Amino acid sequence: MKQQTETEKKVVLLGMSLEELTTVALRMGMPRFAGKQLAEWIYVRRATDFAEMTNISQANRQKLAEIYDLGRYPWSDVQCSVDGTKKYLFPVGEGRFVESVLIPEGDRATLCISSQVGCKMDCLFCMTGKQGWNGNLSAAEILNQIFSVDEAAELTNLVYMGMGEPLDNTDEVLRSIEALTEPWGMGWSPKRITVSTIGAKGLERFLAESRCHLAVSLHSPFPEERRKLMPGEKAFPIMQTLDRIRAYDFSGQRRVSFEYIVFDGLNDDMRHADELAAILRGIPCRINLIRFHKIPAVSLRSSDTARMEAFRKRMESHGYTCTIRASRGEDIFAACGMLSTSKAESSEEKSS
């Protein structure tokens, strides 16, 4: 943590746009094209030290290192599940941490990344919300998760489904997506990236300013019931969210999906399935049914496979594509709703 405290005094280059990097170069007395050189070293070659930038003069590298930091730092812990899932712990400032989850599946390697330390939304079924909100991540801190996992070169997909509500940190999430998808950055196709939301205030900006896929955490088609599960329903009503989505043209390659955790005796009957089908009418979408993963001090239980399968078939009878998502990483608390860094932050406080 000492090293990170020292580098916090410097301006971080990771997360900057080509225009911003060009401004940095010009302020340093470097030629305009040096902005592109910096972008290539940061986003394509993924440099961790200015000394690696061999097509920039040694004098300029030294000047850059005095004022700027590349924003790269390693993970501090990793856990491995019996199913191959890996959970990484990243420090993001003094005494703060976030978790990222690598999910390998055949020839795919998906990284689930965090956008906030904790979360304001306080969903009943989510451990991240239970720890409260301790700040937004910068674009650099978001991107560092992607660059610094052991499998960085093998990643095929990214999902902003880790800790936090991505569209409660819209500015930095969009900055990170820009660096990921623009030709001067990593040049990823937006089709490889999915951003999850409960329907927060940044939704319209996300739809307008990016081309990435959208996943909406829904969990109940009845607003009052949803509000009990997800207090954010009060500020961000699902019906308003659906109206915004319905007004957007999803007929191209961009996709929208709805996440639905299925709770035993709560939202798993045919009445819920029929109402879910009704409120989603007019939206070309996929519904992902998710098992509830038991977390401390919460009495909710997951529906069994038979009821989930009945729910899935009912949705298909209404004309929807509906799947049951396989649970991954439950044994290391890496599955949906199980991410939390409260213990890591508590341990850091005791040791300091």
Curated annotation (Swiss-Prot):
Which organism is the protein's source? Porphyromonas gingivalis (strain ATCC 33277 / DSM 20709 / CIP 103683 / JCM 12257 / NCTC 11834 / 2561)
Entry's HAMAP family? Answer: RNA_methyltr_RlmN
Which cofactor(s) does the record list? [4Fe-4S] cluster
Q: Does the keyword Iron apply?
A: yes
What is this protein called in UniProt?
Answer: Probable dual-specificity RNA methyltransferase RlmN
Q: Kind of enzyme, top EC level? A: transferase
Family affiliation: Belongs to the radical SAM superfamily. RlmN family.
Question: Could you tell me what this protein does?
Answer: Specifically methylates position 2 of adenine 2503 in 23S rRNA and position 2 of adenine 37 in tRNAs.
One record GO biological process = rRNA base methylation
Which branch of life, at top level? Bacteria
Instruction: Please tell me one Gene Ontology term that the record gives under cellular component.
Output: cytoplasm
